[in-house]
């Protein structure tokens, strides 16, 4: 049995430290902790690392599609690794929660997150797990403001707290991973 953990984010150096890429950042931390190294898998539209956690095979995946097209990569990996819906976890930013908030649950909606919407649409189900990481909401109104906000870098204050925040997210999912 294999578990699939998908971080939502955008490919490219310019997005590495943005709020929208917090899913990638958590996977980088998880891979480092369990000695995994990411490698490209163009057929899966992603880079991935295979790790073993408590004798369980876990695939960590960072799609190379953009956030709004995440579902294509999740479906390709689901088929390739023969993963059940219950063994899929998607890690995403959440602008509806303050920075530092962590929520882990199954069978839930998108909360307006386009990557989650696309994943649910492509999988034709929301029966997968989500780890939502609060990144806060912009202080300026409008959809354009939201897009600019999630594509902007963390504030200095947030950067100082980021490692602890990522660790909090990892601790939340370790029981699901078998630890």
Curated annotation (Swiss-Prot):
Active-site residues (renumbered): 20
Q: Name one GO cellular component term.
A: cytoplasm
Q: Where is this site: Stabilizes the basic form of H active site to accept a proton?
A: 93
Tell me the Gene Ontology biological-process terms attached to this UniProt entry: protein quality control for misfolded or incompletely synthesized proteins; rescue of stalled ribosome
Identify the CDD domains for this entry.
PTH (cd00462)
Main localization, broad class: cytoplasm
InterPro entries in alphabetical order: Pept_tRNA_hydro, Pept_tRNA_hydro_CS, Pept_tRNA_hydro_sf
For the site labelled Discriminates between blocked and unblocked aminoacyl-tRNA, the residues are 10
Q: Where in the cell is it found?
A: Cytoplasm
Q: Which UniProt keywords are listed?
A: Cytoplasm, Hydrolase, RNA-binding, tRNA-binding
- Where do the annotations place tRNA binding? 15, 66, 68, 114
Q: Which family does it belong to?
A: Belongs to the PTH family.
Q: How does it assemble?
A: Monomer.
The name of this protein is: Peptidyl-tRNA hydrolase
**Organism in which the protein naturally occurs:** Chlamydia trachomatis serovar D (strain ATCC VR-885 / DSM 19411 / UW-3/Cx)
């Amino acid at each position: 049995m294999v578990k699939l953990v998908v971080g939502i984010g955008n490919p490219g150096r310019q997005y590495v430290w943005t709020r929208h890429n917090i899913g990638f950042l958590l996977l980088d931390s998880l891979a480092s902790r369990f000695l995994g190294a990411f490698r490209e898998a163009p057929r899966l539209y992603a880079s991935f690392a295979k790790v073993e956690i408590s004798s369980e095979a876990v695939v960590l995946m960072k799609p190379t599609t953009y956030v709004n097209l995440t579902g294509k990569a999740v479906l390709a990996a689901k088929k390739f690794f023969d993963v059940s819906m219950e063994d899929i976890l998607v890690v995403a930013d959440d602008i509806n929660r303050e920075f530092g908030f962590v929520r882990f649950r199954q069978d839930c909606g998108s909360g307006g997150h386009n990557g989650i919407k696309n994943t649910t649409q492509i999988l034709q189900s929301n029966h997968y797990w989500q780890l939502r990481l609060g990144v806060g909401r912009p202080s300026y109104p409008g959809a354009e403001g939201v897009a600019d906000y999630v594509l902007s870098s963390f504030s200095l204050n947030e950067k100082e707290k980021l490692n602890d925040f990522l660790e909090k997210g990892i601790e939340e999912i370790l029981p699901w991973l078998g630890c």
